[in-house]
Amino acid sequence: MVGDPTRIVADADVLAADLLVGGNARAALDHVRRHDWLTLAASEQLLDDAESVIETLADPDLATAWRDRIGADTETVEHPPEDHPGLASAYRGEAGHLLSYDDSLRSAKTGLSIQPHADLSIRPPDAFARLFDAESLYEATHDDAYPGPDRDPRA
């Protein structure tokens, strides 16, 4: 599978950190939210995991409100229930990027096992936020000039 670099998956830890902490997780996901030509993909299982983390660390009302909002901002993908939600969402959603704090997903061993099946970059949010270049990606995937950000990431 060739991953589409305009499709991004954020693992549950990154989704929760985006809401509860901000920092690098928010900076990384703001890149996605700023551009309507980028897609945030996630499975229901992945969103369930993130909602559970938010509920545990914050409160149930915030978790429910987050889930209602993220559902509208995410393209849902399906995968077998026994699969790792973040990795499977990236694979089944044909994503080019998986953002995760999970060291085991970013290991050389995992990379070598994924490589024959998917063209997928697995990075922590700080690396994605620092290295992501919307203009060059747009120009590599579209026939016209980069129009700049077209959405408010805080809206």
Put a short name on every predicted segment.
Residues 1-39:
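Short, well-structured N-terminal submotif of metal-dependent ribonuclease cores
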Residues 12, 44, 101-103:
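Short secondary-structure boundary segments
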Residues 15-16, 47, 105-106, 128:
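A generic structural signal for short hydrophobic patches within well-formed alpha-helices
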Residues 16-20, 74-79:
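Short, flexible loop segments at the rims of nucleotide/cofactor-binding pockets, characterized by
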Residues 25, 82-83:
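Amphipathic coiled-coil/heptad-repeat helices and related helical stalk/stem segments
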Residues 31-78, 148-154:
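PIN-domain endoribonuclease scaffold, especially VapC-family toxins
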Residues 83-120:
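Acidic, metal-binding active-site segment of PIN/NYN-like and related structure-specific nucleases
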Residues 106-155:
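Acidic, PIN/NYN-like endoribonuclease modules and their adjacent C-terminal/linker elements
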